[in-house]
């Protein structure tokens, strides 16, 4: 069986940049302030807030998104929106769990959406 790792659809990162920039505008914060408050490097925050179909390998980590959420003091609903935007595969995982999908069925949905698979073989 061939190993297949799909490229993650980069569109979500454009949406993530818009979302975080919106939170910054609401608070009248600069990306530099977000970097300070979140403990992330200015370069990391810049990659996230200035993303325009750039390097597809630049995906923020779960820890980075959590640090941003804490720094911005987001509500529960805002945190969910942030994480769902940063990690669109989470929505598929949630649906799969709720609907009782198998790993193969879940991988089929992830594959169709250009998201990372649960397994390395396809």
Walk through the language-model features, giving the residues of each.
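A short, Lys/Arg-rich alpha-helix, primarily the initiator
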Residues: 1-33, 104-122
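Short C-terminal boundary/hinge segments that cap the last helix of small helical domains
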Residues: 73-90
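Key DNA-contact positions within bacterial/archaeal DNA-binding proteins
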Residues: 32, 43-46, 77
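Short alpha-helical "recognition helix" segments of helix-turn-helix
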Residues: 30-38, 68
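DNA major-groove recognition helix of helix-turn-helix/homeodomain DNA-binding modules
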Residues: 60-78
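Recognition helix of helix-turn-helix/homeodomain-like DNA-binding domains
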Residues: 39-60, 84-85
